[in-house]
């Protein structure tokens, strides 16, 4: 599913790209691309809304309950049972940390390309297309690999590849090398994103997938500002200090960006270390053994 979504993103980009590249002197094509993307998304979502049916059976509300009170009571039940899901909690902590590394890489890829390698708009667009193509294969192959050898192992491999790409970028000096690194990162990061969501479903008890996915989504959204903030403060702080010491502005900015890249690696490595302490077997057992008391 993640691979198909990435492929759809490539198709949308290719459809709007000619107008953005060919029409000069105005930002109208860029503004129009947002409208086109919204329409593209709406049309693509229609089959889901119209033809996919819920498998679950409708359950009547308990006496004296409405949907809001029932939601809060079940949330309280899940919070009270948190000790039962220690492996899932460790998994979420690991996710919060390495996901910030992923967000940092996505948010600053274009800036890194422009500052370190002098990439122009056309080159950045080509870079994004390459990353998207790589992400299709990364999501698809990580899913197959996870089905065969285990999703935890697939996630670890994807994170190791991502860390390798970031470390390589620390020392890379060529534009061609950056294109290769970005493609490897695109391949790895979609594997991370796809497999983490799959593992959330695997770790969720029967009938509580929505609660666990909601917790997973909220945790990721509420923490995702930390990594980019660290990157921005570090890159800017290092650059300003070097400029104050008399270093040429561009060189100072480049060193600042490499300091930021190092922080990406730190987030990914720390997240991986915590992930290695998670027992997939115990997490699955906890989900199977859980019997909620309504």
Residue positions per predicted region:
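Structural signature of the two symmetry-related core transmembrane helices
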Residues: 153-168
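Multi-pass alpha-helical transporter architecture, strongest
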Residues: 40-51, 261-294
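Juxtamembrane intracellular "pre-TM" segments in multi-pass secondary transporters
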Residues: 53-92, 294
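Glycine-rich segments within core transmembrane alpha-helices of 12-TM secondary carriers
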Residues: 1-19, 219-228
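Helix-to-loop junctions at the C-terminal end of transmembrane segments
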Residues: 137-151, 235
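Helix-loop junctions at membrane interfaces in 12-TM secondary transporters
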Residues: 170-181
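A membrane-interface helix-boundary motif in multi-pass transporters
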Residues: 17-39, 233-268
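Short amphipathic helix-loop junctions that connect adjacent transmembrane helices
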Residues: 107-123
């Amino acid at each position: 599913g993640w691979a198909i979504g990435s492929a759809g993103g490539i198709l949308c980009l290719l459809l709007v790209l000619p107008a953005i590249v060919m029409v000069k002197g105005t930002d109208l094509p860029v503004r129009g691309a947002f409208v086109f993307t919204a329409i593209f998304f709406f049309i693509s979502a229609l089959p889901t809304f119209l033809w996919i049916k819920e498998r679950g059976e409708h359950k009547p509300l308990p006496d004296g309950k409405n949907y809001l009170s029932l939601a809060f009571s079940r949330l309280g039940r899940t919070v009270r049972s948190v000790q039962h899901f220690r492996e899932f909690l460790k998994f979420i902590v690991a996710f919060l940390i390495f996901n910030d590394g992923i967000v940092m890489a996505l948010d600053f890829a274009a800036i890194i390309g422009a500052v370190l390698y002098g990439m122009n708009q056309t080159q950045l667009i080509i870079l994004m297309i390459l990353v998207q193509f790589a992400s299709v294969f990364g999501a698809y192959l990580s899913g197959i690999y996870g089905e065969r050898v285990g999703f935890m192992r697939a996630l670890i491999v994807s994170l190791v590849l991502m860390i390798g790409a970031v470390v390589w970028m620390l020392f890379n000096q060529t534009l061609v090398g950056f294109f290769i690194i970005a493609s490897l990162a695109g391949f790895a990061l979609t594997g991370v994103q796809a497999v983490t969501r799959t593992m959330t479903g695997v770790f969720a008890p029967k009938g509580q997938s929505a609660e666990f996915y909601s917790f997973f989504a909220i945790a990721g959204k509420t923490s995702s500002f930390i990594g980019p903030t660290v990157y921005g403060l570090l890159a800017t702080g290092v650059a300003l200090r070097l400029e104050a010491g008399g270093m040429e502005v561009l060189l100072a900015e480049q060193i600042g960006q490499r300091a930021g890249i190092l922080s990406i690696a730190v987030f990914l490595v720390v997240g991986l270390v915590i992930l290695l302490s998670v027992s997939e077997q115990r997490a699955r057992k906890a989900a199977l053994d859980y019997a909620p008391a309504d």
